[in-house]
C-alpha cells in the first residue's frame, strides 16, 4: 500500500488569537493492486481428433482466424502440444471446460489443459 499524507492546519489561539497547535498529518492509504496470474490454454495432440475439428475449436472458442487456427493446429500435430491463448484463471478454466465439453459432445478424445505462465 502507498501512504499519501494529507496536511491540515490547526485551529485555535495562535498569534492571531487562536491556539495554533501546528500542522496535523492524516495518512490516506491507497491500496496497491496486484495483476492477476495468467494461464496458458493448451491443446494436446491425439491420433483420433480430425485436424478440421481442431481448427473449428480454435475459431469458435479462441476467436482465431482460419490462418492462425491452421498454424496452431499444425503446431499441435507436429509438436504434441500448442498454445491457444493466455488468460486469467477464470477465463482459462472456462475455455478448457468449453473445449472439453464440445469435444465430448462430438465424440472426440481431444484434450485441453491450462498451466500457469
Swiss-Prot record:
Binds to the N-terminal domain of the chaperone ClpA. GO terms for biological process: protein catabolic process; proteolysis. Disulfide bonds: none annotated. This is ATP-dependent Clp protease adapter protein ClpS 1. It comes from Agrobacterium fabrum (strain C58 / ATCC 33970). Pfam families: ClpS (PF02617). Belongs to the ClpS family. InterPro entries: ClpS, ClpS_core, Ribosomal_bL12_C/ClpS-like. Involved in the modulation of the specificity of the ClpAP-mediated ATP-dependent protein degradation.
Amino acid at each position: 500500500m502507498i501512504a499519501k499524507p494529507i496536511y491540515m492546519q490547526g485551529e485555535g489561539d495562535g498569534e492571531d488569537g487562536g491556539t495554533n497547535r501546528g500542522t496535523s498529518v492524516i495518512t490516506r492509504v491507497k491500496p496497491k493492486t496486484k495483476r492477476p496470474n495468467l494461464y496458458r490454454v493448451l491443446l494436446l495432440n491425439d491420433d483420433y481428433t480430425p485436424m478440421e475439428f481442431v481448427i473449428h475449436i480454435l475459431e469458435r472458442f479462441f476467436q482465431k482466424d482460419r490462418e492462425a487456427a491452421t498454424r496452431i493446429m499444425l503446431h499441435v500435430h507436429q509438436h504434441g502440444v500448442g498454445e491457444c491463448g493466455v488468460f486469467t484463471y477464470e477465463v482459462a478454466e472456462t475455455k478448457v471446460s468449453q473445449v472439453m465439453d464440445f469435444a465430448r459432445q462430438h465424440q472426440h478424445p481431444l484434450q485441453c489443459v491450462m498451466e500457469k505462465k
